[in-house]
Structures are given as C-alpha cells and as structure tokens.
C-alpha cells in the first residue's frame, strides 16, 4: 500500500513510519521543511514538502495514494483549525472511496472515569474540547475512517512522563507531583501505539474510535515513586500555576482503562515494558 503520512518526524509518527516501512508499505511523508524531508527520506519515505492546511494541495497529494495516517499536530491553539483543514482535504480526496483514513485523537476526550472504553461518553477538558466536533466530521462521513485514541504515550525516554521525571523538588528534595498524585493515567508504549496505527490501517475497515492503551493505569504517585525519589503532592492551584490551567486540568484527570477489545480483535496487544519499569530502570532512568 502507498500510504500518505503526516507527522513522520514526530514522537509517534516517526515510529509509525518505521513500522509501515517494516510491514512493506510505501510511505509518502508530508513535511514542512527540507530538514524534515531529509529525516523521513533517511527512514525510507518519499518526502513531500508542503502546508497541511492548504486543503486543495493536500487533497491532490491524497488522490495519489492508497490510504493515509494523520499524526501531525502543532500542539497549540492552532490545532483545531489545523485538524479541520486536514479532515477537509481527506473528505475531498477519499470520500466515497474504499481508501482507509486513520485520524488521531487522545484519551483525554473521555474525561475522568473508571473502566472507560471507546463507547464511554465524551467529556473532554477545555484543552481538547474541540476534538469531538472535528472527529464527528471524520466519523459522520462517507470515509472508511478510524480514529486511534492514544493514552499517555511513553517509551525511548520521550513524551509526557518527563513531566514527572523532570518535576521540581521541594525544600526537602522530594519530587513534586502533579496535584496530589492519586489520579490514574492511561498509558501505552510508543512502539505499541505505532503498531496499532498499522493494524487499523491494514484492516481496511471503518473501525470508529480504537483505544491505544494498556491496563496498567498507574497513579501519578506510582510514577513519581518509580523514579526512586521521595514524592510530595501539590495543591491543585499550584499545579495550575506551574503548568497552565488547561494543561494541568488534563493531567489531573483520573482515568482507568482496559486493553481495547476493538484493538485486540485487530490482533493488537501491548508488548512494550510498563511505564513503571521504564521509569525505574529503563529509558527514563538512563536519560535521568
């Protein structure tokens, strides 16, 4: 399959690129700069430099491929319009065809809860409150579309766990947690996340939302203690001041999940080390 990939130099997208190539697919990677083009070319992709918010241009690129995976995100206030533009181009190019499209969401869209799954009500925090409207454009259309919903992604010393590893210390040298640390995080290794993108794409089906998550569900205090440090909770108002209110409120969500039955039906199961082990003796300990 010839697959158009966005975000091919990113934390998740670079692993998706590697696994697509490993599975024998040809990859056309849309990038924003010549430097990024060199990086994806070195990974075996055909680079195309362009603007993902140019819907007409992107639709033209999409018409020449067999499927697409969208992992790119500016990660700022422009994210809603960015995703709307990409989805608009995909609908123009893939609408009414059998070409599979895989979109990216995030676990925070479900808000706090235990035993959450794909069918749980959406209750996003302010930071990702825009996602349901954009995702409805993906799902309520004539696309063969799926949305991978990654948990807090970890592995290779990257991602949000570094907010715990690199947290400030109090006067006694204790690691300061995000809030009181009792909240659970859904988590997933980045390599397992990439494997799910490939499995969803290769299914050729409209899978709806598919969670990329393990059943580890550590608390933030578990993560802090896994670094080998003594830990101390932080009042919510101080966490909000330190990290920004919207970001902090997302990190303060208390979420618990099981491995997705939908993902399992596609042959997926988590293979990577747990986040607690990664923090204790794996890639984060090595980077620390």
Predicted regions and their residues:
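Mid/C-terminal beta-alpha module of Rossmann-like enzyme folds, strongest
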Residues: 2, 196-247, 286-288
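N-terminal Rossmann NAD(P)H-binding glycine-rich loop of SDR-like oxidoreductase domains
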Residues: 3-23
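C-terminal amphipathic/interface module of NAD(P)-dependent oxidoreductases
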Residues: 50, 249-288
């Amino acid at each position: 399959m010839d697959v158009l990939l966005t975000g091919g130099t990113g934390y998740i997208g670079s692993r998706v690129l590697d696994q697509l190539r490993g599975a024998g697919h040809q990859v056309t990677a849309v990038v924003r700069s010549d430097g990024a083009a060199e990086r994806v070319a070195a990974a075996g992709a055909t680079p195309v430099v362009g603007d993902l918010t140019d819907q007409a241009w992107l639709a033209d690129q999409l018409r020449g491929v067999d499927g697409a995976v969208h992992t790119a995100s500016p990660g700022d206030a422009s994210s809603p319009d960015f995703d709307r533009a990409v989805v608009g181009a995909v609908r123009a190019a893939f609408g009414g065809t059998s070409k599979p499209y895989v979109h990216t969401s995030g676990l925070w869209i479900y808000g706090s809860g235990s035993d959450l799954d794909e069918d749980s009500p959406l209750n996003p925090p302010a930071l990702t409150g825009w996602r349901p409207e954009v995702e409805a454009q993906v799902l309520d259309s004539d696309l063969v579309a799926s949305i991978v919903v990654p948990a807090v992604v970890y592995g290779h010393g990257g991602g949000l766990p570094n907010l715990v590893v690199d947290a400030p210390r109090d006067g006694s040298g204790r690691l300061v947690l995000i809030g009181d640390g009792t909240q659970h995080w859904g988590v997933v290794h980045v390599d397992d996340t990439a494997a799910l993108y490939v499995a969803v794409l290769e299914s050729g089906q409209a899978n709806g939302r598919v969670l990329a998550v393990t059943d580890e569900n550590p608390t933030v205090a578990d993560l802090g203690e896994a670094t080998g440090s003594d830990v101390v909770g932080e009042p919510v108002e101080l966490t909000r001041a330190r990290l920004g209110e919207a970001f902090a409120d997302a990190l303060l969500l208390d979420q618990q999940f099981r491995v997705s039955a939908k993902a399992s039906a596609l042959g997926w199961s988590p293979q990577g080390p747990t986040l607690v082990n990664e923090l204790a003796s794996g890639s984060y300990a090595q980077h620390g």
